[in-house]
Protein backbone atom coordinates (compact mmCIF):
# COMPACT_ATOMS: atom_id res chain seq x y z
CA UNK A 1 0.00 0.00 0.00
CA UNK A 2 1.30 3.48 -0.87
CA UNK A 3 2.36 5.68 2.01
CA UNK A 4 -0.01 8.48 2.91
CA UNK A 5 1.30 11.80 1.61
CA UNK A 6 1.87 14.46 4.29
CA UNK A 7 -0.38 17.37 3.41
CA UNK A 8 0.73 20.74 4.68
CA UNK A 9 -2.78 22.12 4.78
CA UNK A 10 -2.61 24.10 8.04
CA UNK A 11 -0.69 27.34 8.39
CA UNK A 12 2.56 27.01 10.35
CA UNK A 13 3.43 29.19 13.37
CA UNK A 14 6.54 29.23 15.60
CA UNK A 15 6.02 29.89 19.29
CA UNK A 16 7.89 29.38 22.54
CA UNK A 17 7.57 29.58 26.30
CA UNK A 18 9.37 32.43 28.08
CA UNK A 19 9.55 33.52 31.73
CA UNK A 20 11.46 33.22 35.00
CA UNK A 21 13.24 30.03 36.05
CA UNK A 22 10.97 27.50 37.86
CA UNK A 23 7.76 29.32 36.96
CA UNK A 24 6.62 26.29 34.94
CA UNK A 25 7.62 26.86 31.30
CA UNK A 26 8.65 23.25 30.67
CA UNK A 27 5.71 21.82 32.65
CA UNK A 28 3.34 23.93 30.54
CA UNK A 29 5.04 22.75 27.33
CA UNK A 30 4.60 19.13 28.46
CA UNK A 31 0.96 19.78 29.44
CA UNK A 32 0.15 21.26 26.00
CA UNK A 33 1.54 18.19 24.20
CA UNK A 34 -0.29 15.83 26.58
CA UNK A 35 -3.70 17.49 26.28
CA UNK A 36 -3.43 17.81 22.48
CA UNK A 37 -2.16 14.23 22.13
CA UNK A 38 -5.44 13.00 23.64
CA UNK A 39 -7.19 14.68 20.71
CA UNK A 40 -4.76 13.09 18.23
CA UNK A 41 -3.09 16.45 17.51
CA UNK A 42 0.32 15.86 19.09
CA UNK A 43 2.75 13.30 20.38
CA UNK A 44 2.97 13.67 24.16
CA UNK A 45 6.44 14.72 25.34
CA UNK A 46 7.15 14.25 29.01
CA UNK A 47 8.93 16.80 31.17
CA UNK A 48 12.23 14.89 31.23
CA UNK A 49 12.42 14.71 27.41
CA UNK A 50 11.87 18.43 27.05
CA UNK A 51 14.20 19.29 29.92
CA UNK A 52 17.09 17.26 28.46
CA UNK A 53 17.30 19.59 25.48
CA UNK A 54 19.92 18.74 22.87
CA UNK A 55 22.82 21.09 22.19
CA UNK A 56 22.80 23.00 18.92
CA UNK A 57 25.29 25.30 17.34
CA UNK A 58 24.06 28.52 15.80
CA UNK A 59 26.64 30.94 14.40
CA UNK A 60 29.38 29.42 16.55
CA UNK A 61 27.36 29.54 19.77
CA UNK A 62 26.20 26.44 21.63
CA UNK A 63 22.56 26.58 22.70
CA UNK A 64 20.35 24.01 24.41
CA UNK A 65 16.81 24.10 23.04
CA UNK A 66 13.95 21.64 23.07
CA UNK A 67 11.66 21.59 20.03
CA UNK A 68 8.20 20.03 20.18
CA UNK A 69 5.49 20.18 17.57
CA UNK A 70 1.75 19.93 17.80
CA UNK A 71 -1.41 20.95 16.00
CA UNK A 72 -4.68 22.60 16.84
CA UNK A 73 -7.78 22.34 14.65
CA UNK A 74 -6.54 25.43 12.80
CA UNK A 75 -2.74 25.35 12.78
CA UNK A 76 0.54 23.49 12.98
CA UNK A 77 2.90 24.76 15.71
CA UNK A 78 6.62 24.39 16.34
CA UNK A 79 7.26 25.21 20.00
CA UNK A 80 10.63 25.90 21.59
CA UNK A 81 11.52 25.67 25.25
CA UNK A 82 15.03 26.34 26.57
CA UNK A 83 16.17 24.90 29.90
CA UNK A 84 18.48 27.64 31.16
CA UNK A 85 18.17 31.41 31.24
CA UNK A 86 21.39 31.84 29.22
CA UNK A 87 19.93 29.51 26.56
CA UNK A 88 16.88 31.78 26.23
CA UNK A 89 19.00 34.87 25.85
CA UNK A 90 21.20 33.23 23.21
CA UNK A 91 18.22 31.71 21.43
CA UNK A 92 16.30 34.94 21.12
CA UNK A 93 19.31 37.00 20.04
CA UNK A 94 20.77 34.58 17.50
CA UNK A 95 17.31 33.82 16.15
CA UNK A 96 18.18 30.13 16.18
CA UNK A 97 14.46 29.67 16.49
CA UNK A 98 12.51 32.66 15.28
CA UNK A 99 9.32 33.07 17.33
CA UNK A 100 6.14 34.52 15.84
CA UNK A 101 4.68 34.79 19.33
CA UNK A 102 5.42 33.70 22.89
CA UNK A 103 3.65 32.31 25.94
CA UNK A 104 4.87 34.24 28.98
CA UNK A 105 4.64 31.96 32.02
CA UNK A 106 4.39 33.70 35.40
CA UNK A 107 3.92 31.81 38.67
CA UNK A 108 1.01 33.34 40.58
CA UNK A 109 2.88 32.41 43.78
CA UNK A 110 5.81 34.73 42.89
CA UNK A 111 4.58 37.30 40.43
CA UNK A 112 6.97 38.89 37.91
CA UNK A 113 10.65 38.23 38.67
CA UNK A 114 13.91 39.59 37.15
CA UNK A 115 13.98 37.12 34.23
CA UNK A 116 10.30 37.82 33.53
CA UNK A 117 11.30 41.41 32.84
CA UNK A 118 14.41 40.42 30.88
CA UNK A 119 12.51 38.01 28.62
CA UNK A 120 9.85 40.65 27.90
CA UNK A 121 12.58 43.17 27.03
CA UNK A 122 14.31 40.63 24.77
CA UNK A 123 11.05 39.74 23.04
CA UNK A 124 10.52 43.44 22.33
CA UNK A 125 14.11 43.96 21.09
CA UNK A 126 14.19 40.98 18.74
CA UNK A 127 10.73 41.56 17.27
CA UNK A 128 8.48 38.97 18.95
CA UNK A 129 5.36 41.13 18.74
CA UNK A 130 2.70 38.93 20.31
CA UNK A 131 2.62 37.60 23.87
CA UNK A 132 -0.07 35.52 25.58
CA UNK A 133 0.24 35.27 29.38
CA UNK A 134 -0.26 32.08 31.39
CA UNK A 135 -0.51 32.68 35.15
CA UNK A 136 0.63 29.32 36.49
CA UNK A 137 0.31 27.62 39.91
CA UNK A 138 -2.95 29.46 40.67
CA UNK A 139 -4.07 26.36 42.61
CA UNK A 140 -1.43 27.25 45.24
CA UNK A 141 -2.86 30.74 45.86
CA UNK A 142 -5.94 30.82 48.08
CA UNK A 143 -6.85 34.44 47.54
CA UNK A 144 -8.11 35.41 44.07
CA UNK A 145 -7.30 39.04 44.79
CA UNK A 146 -3.61 38.14 44.99
CA UNK A 147 -3.83 36.58 41.52
CA UNK A 148 -5.58 39.75 40.28
CA UNK A 149 -2.68 41.75 41.67
CA UNK A 150 -0.12 39.57 39.88
CA UNK A 151 -2.07 39.94 36.63
CA UNK A 152 -2.06 43.71 37.02
CA UNK A 153 1.71 43.73 37.61
CA UNK A 154 2.32 41.59 34.51
CA UNK A 155 0.13 43.86 32.37
CA UNK A 156 2.00 46.95 33.61
CA UNK A 157 5.35 45.30 32.88
CA UNK A 158 4.25 44.44 29.33
CA UNK A 159 3.08 48.02 28.73
CA UNK A 160 6.45 49.30 29.95
CA UNK A 161 8.10 47.47 27.02
CA UNK A 162 5.60 48.67 24.38
CA UNK A 163 3.35 45.60 24.39
CA UNK A 164 -0.42 46.31 24.60
CA UNK A 165 -0.56 45.39 28.31
CA UNK A 166 -4.27 46.16 28.68
CA UNK A 167 -5.25 43.93 25.75
CA UNK A 168 -2.86 40.99 26.09
CA UNK A 169 -4.82 37.79 26.81
CA UNK A 170 -4.16 36.36 30.30
CA UNK A 171 -5.12 32.80 31.27
CA UNK A 172 -4.97 31.29 34.74
CA UNK A 173 -4.35 27.69 35.66
CA UNK A 174 -2.04 24.94 36.81
CA UNK A 175 0.17 23.28 34.21
CA UNK A 176 1.08 20.52 36.67
CA UNK A 177 -2.58 19.68 37.39
CA UNK A 178 -3.29 19.58 33.64
CA UNK A 179 -0.34 17.23 33.20
CA UNK A 180 -1.74 15.03 35.99
CA UNK A 181 -5.07 14.77 34.15
CA UNK A 182 -7.29 17.23 36.05
CA UNK A 183 -10.24 17.76 33.66
CA UNK A 184 -10.83 21.40 34.59
CA UNK A 185 -7.14 22.25 34.04
CA UNK A 186 -7.04 20.31 30.76
CA UNK A 187 -9.83 22.61 29.58
CA UNK A 188 -7.69 25.64 30.54
CA UNK A 189 -4.92 24.28 28.27
CA UNK A 190 -7.41 23.97 25.39
CA UNK A 191 -8.58 27.54 26.09
CA UNK A 192 -4.94 28.65 26.00
CA UNK A 193 -4.45 27.04 22.59
CA UNK A 194 -7.69 28.61 21.26
CA UNK A 195 -6.42 31.98 22.48
CA UNK A 196 -3.05 31.48 20.75
CA UNK A 197 -4.87 30.47 17.54
CA UNK A 198 -6.85 33.71 17.66
CA UNK A 199 -4.38 36.22 19.10
CA UNK A 200 -1.07 35.37 17.43
CA UNK A 201 -1.46 36.13 13.72
CA UNK A 202 -0.25 33.76 11.02
CA UNK A 203 3.13 35.09 9.89
CA UNK A 204 3.65 36.31 6.37
CA UNK A 205 5.22 33.48 4.39
CA UNK A 206 8.87 34.02 3.65
CA UNK A 207 8.19 33.88 -0.10
CA UNK A 208 5.65 36.74 0.17
CA UNK A 209 8.19 39.19 1.61
CA UNK A 210 10.31 41.50 -0.58
CA UNK A 211 13.18 39.71 -2.31
CA UNK A 212 16.57 39.74 -0.54
CA UNK A 213 19.72 37.76 -1.35
CA UNK A 214 23.11 38.36 0.32
CA UNK A 215 25.84 38.07 -2.33
CA UNK A 216 28.35 35.31 -1.57
CA UNK A 217 30.25 35.10 -4.82
CA UNK A 218 30.57 36.98 -8.12
CA UNK A 219 31.83 35.62 -11.43
CA UNK A 220 31.72 36.40 -15.14
CA UNK A 221 30.27 34.21 -17.87
CA UNK A 222 32.03 35.22 -21.10
CA UNK A 223 29.59 36.66 -23.58
CA UNK A 224 26.71 36.70 -21.09
CA UNK A 225 27.72 38.95 -18.23
CA UNK A 226 28.09 39.04 -14.46
CA UNK A 227 26.55 36.47 -12.11
CA UNK A 228 25.98 37.04 -8.38
CA UNK A 229 25.37 33.91 -6.35
CA UNK A 230 24.00 33.31 -2.87
CA UNK A 231 21.14 31.93 -0.82
CA UNK A 232 17.83 33.74 -1.10
CA UNK A 233 16.97 35.04 2.34
CA UNK A 234 13.34 35.92 1.64
CA UNK A 235 10.90 36.55 -1.17
CA UNK A 236 11.25 35.26 -4.71
CA UNK A 237 12.90 36.34 -7.93
CA UNK A 238 11.77 35.83 -11.52
CA UNK A 239 13.66 36.31 -14.77
CA UNK A 240 12.97 39.88 -15.91
CA UNK A 241 12.60 41.28 -12.37
CA UNK A 242 14.33 44.53 -11.46
CA UNK A 243 16.66 44.38 -8.46
CA UNK A 244 18.96 46.77 -6.62
CA UNK A 245 22.54 46.04 -5.58
CA UNK A 246 22.78 47.53 -2.08
CA UNK A 247 25.53 47.93 0.53
CA UNK A 248 29.21 48.80 1.06
CA UNK A 249 28.87 51.76 -1.35
CA UNK A 250 26.87 54.95 -1.05
CA UNK A 251 25.25 54.42 -4.47
CA UNK A 252 22.60 51.85 -5.24
CA UNK A 253 22.92 50.12 -8.64
CA UNK A 254 19.69 49.15 -10.42
CA UNK A 255 19.72 46.17 -12.75
CA UNK A 256 17.51 43.45 -14.25
CA UNK A 257 17.85 39.72 -13.67
CA UNK A 258 18.20 38.13 -17.10
CA UNK A 259 18.76 34.55 -15.97
CA UNK A 260 18.59 32.34 -12.85
CA UNK A 261 20.53 29.13 -12.34
CA UNK A 262 20.42 26.53 -9.60
CA UNK A 263 22.58 23.38 -9.63
CA UNK A 264 23.63 24.21 -13.22
CA UNK A 265 20.00 24.19 -14.36
CA UNK A 266 18.06 27.27 -15.42
CA UNK A 267 15.07 28.32 -13.32
CA UNK A 268 12.13 30.64 -13.98
CA UNK A 269 11.69 31.50 -10.30
CA UNK A 270 14.02 31.29 -7.30
CA UNK A 271 12.50 31.45 -3.82
CA UNK A 272 13.52 31.80 -0.15
CA UNK A 273 16.00 29.06 0.77
CA UNK A 274 17.29 28.43 -2.78
CA UNK A 275 20.99 28.75 -3.57
CA UNK A 276 21.05 30.48 -6.95
CA UNK A 277 23.17 32.41 -9.40
CA UNK A 278 21.52 35.51 -10.86
CA UNK A 279 22.71 36.88 -14.20
CA UNK A 280 22.63 40.68 -14.04
CA UNK A 281 22.12 42.89 -17.10
CA UNK A 282 24.73 45.55 -17.85
CA UNK A 283 26.65 45.08 -14.61
CA UNK A 284 30.46 44.88 -14.55
CA UNK A 285 32.28 42.31 -12.48
CA UNK A 286 33.64 45.04 -10.17
CA UNK A 287 30.17 46.57 -9.55
CA UNK A 288 29.12 43.69 -7.29
CA UNK A 289 31.04 42.35 -4.28
CA UNK A 290 30.52 39.78 -1.56
CA UNK A 291 28.70 41.36 1.38
CA UNK A 292 26.30 43.40 -0.74
CA UNK A 293 22.71 42.25 -1.23
CA UNK A 294 20.41 41.94 -4.23
CA UNK A 295 17.04 43.30 -3.16
CA UNK A 296 13.60 44.24 -4.42
CA UNK A 297 13.76 47.95 -5.39
CA UNK A 298 13.28 50.26 -2.40
CA UNK A 299 12.98 47.42 0.12
CA UNK A 300 16.25 47.93 2.03
CA UNK A 301 18.68 50.82 2.50
CA UNK A 302 22.27 51.15 3.68
CA UNK A 303 23.05 52.40 7.17
CA UNK A 304 26.15 52.98 9.24
CA UNK A 305 24.68 53.53 12.69
CA UNK A 306 22.40 51.19 14.60
CA UNK A 307 21.48 49.89 18.03
CA UNK A 308 22.00 46.18 18.58
CA UNK A 309 20.88 43.66 21.20
CA UNK A 310 23.95 41.48 21.65
CA UNK A 311 25.07 38.38 23.54
CA UNK A 312 28.82 38.32 24.27
CA UNK A 313 30.30 34.83 24.47
CA UNK A 314 31.81 33.67 27.74
CA UNK A 315 35.42 32.52 27.94
CA UNK A 316 34.23 28.88 28.10
CA UNK A 317 32.33 29.37 24.84
CA UNK A 318 35.51 30.50 23.10
CA UNK A 319 34.81 34.20 23.59
CA UNK A 320 36.93 36.98 25.04
CA UNK A 321 38.74 36.50 28.34
CA UNK A 322 38.48 40.16 29.33
CA UNK A 323 35.75 42.81 29.39
CA UNK A 324 35.48 45.55 26.76
CA UNK A 325 34.61 49.24 27.04
CA UNK A 326 33.19 51.99 24.80
CA UNK A 327 35.27 52.61 21.64
CA UNK A 328 35.97 48.87 21.26
CA UNK A 329 36.39 48.25 17.48
CA UNK A 330 35.61 44.65 16.47
CA UNK A 331 34.28 43.43 13.11
CA UNK A 332 30.57 43.02 12.53
CA UNK A 333 29.76 40.14 10.20
CA UNK A 334 26.58 41.04 8.30
CA UNK A 335 25.16 38.73 5.62
CA UNK A 336 28.45 37.51 4.11
CA UNK A 337 31.14 39.99 5.10
CA UNK A 338 32.99 41.68 7.98
CA UNK A 339 32.77 45.44 8.48
CA UNK A 340 34.64 47.23 11.28
CA UNK A 341 32.52 49.25 13.70
CA UNK A 342 32.98 51.33 16.83
CA UNK A 343 30.89 50.39 19.87
CA UNK A 344 29.37 52.98 22.18
CA UNK A 345 28.00 51.56 25.44
CA UNK A 346 24.94 53.07 27.15
CA UNK A 347 25.63 55.64 29.90
CA UNK A 348 24.80 53.22 32.71
CA UNK A 349 27.14 50.48 31.42
CA UNK A 350 30.83 50.98 32.13
CA UNK A 351 32.04 47.70 30.62
CA UNK A 352 30.74 44.44 29.18
CA UNK A 353 31.92 41.12 30.60
CA UNK A 354 32.16 37.87 28.62
CA UNK A 355 28.80 36.07 29.07
CA UNK A 356 26.77 39.32 29.31
CA UNK A 357 23.97 40.49 27.08
CA UNK A 358 23.79 44.19 26.35
CA UNK A 359 22.26 46.85 24.11
CA UNK A 360 24.81 49.12 22.48
CA UNK A 361 25.20 51.55 19.57
CA UNK A 362 27.51 50.77 16.66
CA UNK A 363 28.93 53.08 14.01
CA UNK A 364 30.25 51.11 11.00
CA UNK A 365 33.08 52.40 8.81
CA UNK A 366 31.15 51.40 5.65
CA UNK A 367 27.41 51.49 4.94
CA UNK A 368 25.72 48.07 5.04
CA UNK A 369 22.25 46.95 3.90
CA UNK A 370 20.52 46.41 7.24
CA UNK A 371 17.12 46.87 8.90
CA UNK A 372 15.51 46.15 12.27
CA UNK A 373 15.81 42.40 12.78
CA UNK A 374 19.01 41.87 10.73
CA UNK A 375 21.25 39.33 12.47
CA UNK A 376 25.01 39.72 12.84
CA UNK A 377 27.99 38.24 14.64
CA UNK A 378 30.73 40.19 16.40
CA UNK A 379 34.20 38.95 15.46
CA UNK A 380 37.75 39.62 16.50
CA UNK A 381 40.62 38.26 14.42
CA UNK A 382 38.28 35.83 12.67
CA UNK A 383 36.87 34.44 15.95
CA UNK A 384 33.25 34.92 16.96
CA UNK A 385 33.01 36.84 20.24
CA UNK A 386 29.31 37.71 20.15
CA UNK A 387 26.02 37.51 18.29
CA UNK A 388 23.39 40.14 17.88
CA UNK A 389 20.35 41.53 16.16
CA UNK A 390 19.68 45.08 14.97
CA UNK A 391 17.02 46.50 17.31
CA UNK A 392 16.91 50.03 15.87
CA UNK A 393 18.37 52.01 12.97
CA UNK A 394 20.03 55.14 14.31
CA UNK A 395 21.23 57.31 11.42
Curated annotation (Swiss-Prot):
Residues 174-176 are annotated as: G5. Pfam families: GTP_EFTU, GTP_EFTU_D2, GTP_EFTU_D3. Residues 19-26 are annotated as: G1. One of its GO terms (molecular function) is translation elongation factor activity. GTP binds at residues 19-26, 81-85, 136-139. Belongs to the TRAFAC class translation factor GTPase superfamily. Classic translation factor GTPase family. EF-Tu/EF-1A subfamily. GTP hydrolase that promotes the GTP-dependent binding of aminoacyl-tRNA to the A-site of ribosomes during protein biosynthesis. This is Elongation factor Tu. The lineage of its organism: Bacteria, Bacillati, Bacillota, Bacilli, Lactobacillales.
